[in-house]
Amino acid sequence: MGVRRATIVLLAAVAALLLAAPAPAALSDGIRYLRLQQNGDGGFGEPGERSDPSLTAWAVVGLKTAGSSPRRPEAAAEYLHESGDRNVTDLELRILALDALGRGTGILADRLRAKRQRSGRIGPSVNSTIWGILALRAVGRPAGKASVRYLLRAQRPSGGWAWTPNGAADSNDTAAAIQALRSAGVSRNSRAIVRGLRFLRRLQNRDGGFELARGRGSDAQSTAWAIQAFVSTRRAAGRSAFAYLARLQRRNGSYRYSRTYATTPLWVTSHVVPAVAKRAYPPK
């Protein structure tokens, strides 16, 4: 009886490990889908649409973070190199993507540093500060003590972060802020990080997915970013979150936005594959 019980316990432990690990087929299918969306000009676009600089940057960053790369990395780099920046976050994404492709980003990083204000804010918002920190850390530049302090002060009473200083906190900005703070060396056990993770956990639904804000319903991107936040703090997001993402994967490898909508598959899949790979931003 003792041997039988020990065998059952062992099998249960193995099953738990298998469920917690990212499914190799799911990850490889998602990566393959992304790689196939590269257009002739080197950029990436949604199916049947022209290349877009922002989507190209997201695809490259998603692939790199998940441990892969575009089919034609040099073409992607050239496309991004020739693309302009409509705003600060475009610049930050371009830095992340070009660095992921092995291109020099010194001039762009200097431009980004020039966007830092005396308060530590980078660009016009909390969101642009988050991605500014991630971009600078990706290329080996210091985040800047003032920027880290600004981001810590921007934490809302709920424990989350918002796009703007006085906005309503949401899961996406909170997850990204946690990853930015971790990349800047903030302890995973700091009060700010722990409060941020608790805020995220309150936005997890019974289906295992996370939602952008209370009442919005679970979606793939919010779930993926929440997983990455937990990964960055070396904590488990929980099997139910991965199971939720698995249910949204389509036969072609892409991910639905939610159970109801299957819009912008390139954009959504770019955000999901790093989470399935259990890797956080910035890409390494």
Residue ranges with predicted function:
Residues A20-P22:
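N-terminal signal peptide c-region/cleavage motif recognized by signal peptidases
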Residues A26-N39:
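Short N-terminal segments immediately surrounding and downstream of signal-peptide cleavage
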